[in-house]
Amino acid sequence: MSSEKEPNWNLGCNLLLTAVLVGVALLYFSVKNAYNHTLQPGQSVTIRVRPNTDQVEYSSELILEKKDDKKIKLSGRDVWSEQFSGLYLEVKEKKIIQLGNSGNDDTELPNNQQDIQLVEDGIVVSYLGKKVFDVTSSKPYNITVTNVDDKPASFYTQVVNR
């Protein structure tokens, strides 16, 4: 009798193991693809920034990894800054400021940078690769990413709260 139950038990364990592995794989790919975007010309995606204000010191970062050199516009902030670069893009004042080593050596740069330009309501980026932007705020808000190129644009985004 035990020999008849053993194949059924093995079959059940194999099916359960297969179902768990397939479920984990589906979960992994669905989470991974949630941050990958391909936008057609003119299309937008909204990214929600929810700062962790319960902490004494908090910060939020936007990780933007562009998979091509197509132009996308980031809007939703008055000041954009690339982390650890000392570069501040002030949208309302239409200024690009490069901070100096000491606090007094700030330099205003022309709006003709190779991979980041100021526009009326945000910045347009056209670099290839990964950059991290400081998007810290005391209240939740939205960042809108719009494809302003004439071809599809692919990129990865993630907001990280520290």
Regions of interest found by a model, annotated:
Residues 4-162:
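Acidic, Ser/Thr/Pro
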